[in-house]
Structure formats: structure tokens, C-alpha cells
């Protein structure tokens, strides 16, 4: 909700969950809204998903910063200029992976900082 701005959420759910962001389309003033999400328990089944509000369409702009890359040296999959979901895959996360989220009033900017380049995807 809009009241959650500035909070830090620690995720301790091994079975995964979905975090729904406040909806920009609902008309609530969200300019400057922000939060941080920190993974404290590995997601061992399902996924951890950050999703936009129900009335929004492709308002998430996602970027991934990774600590390591595979031998093939591929780019992180978790980068998008407009998407609905940012997904942290089960088994690819590391305790301490985090997401910084800030709203401009028209977009939700999600910066994922993860250990593994295969950990984050967007859709």
C-alpha cells in the first residue's frame, strides 16, 4: 500500500510468495514511493514474484545487477523497459539478494541485486 513507503521487507518464506506493488492507475499519489526487499531464506519451491498493481499495465522497469555470470557470459535475463512481473527463481536465489523499488508516479523501477545471473527473469 501507499503506507508501506520506506519500509524494508525481509522475505523468510521458502515456499515462495507474490509481493503486489501499489497500483499507479488507482490515482493514489505514489511519486517517491519506495521500499527494499531482502531475501533472508532461500526460496526452495515455487518463486518469489514482484508484480504490478491489478489496474496497471507494464509499469515495472526492471534492471538486474549480478555478482557472478555463467561460463557462457550471457547478459542478465531480468532487464525490461516495461513488464508486469519480476521473478526470482527457486534454487537460484541466495540469502542477501535484494530488490530496491522506487516509483516515479508513472513507473515502478525495480533494481535487483542478486548473486546468480540466472536468478531473475521478467514477464
Q: What feature does the model see in each segment?
A:
Residues 1-70, 103-123:
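Exposed extracellular interaction/assembly regions and N-terminal maturation sites
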Residues 95-103:
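Extracellular disulfide-bonded cysteine-rich modules/repeats
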Residues 66-84:
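Surface-exposed intrinsically disordered loops and tails
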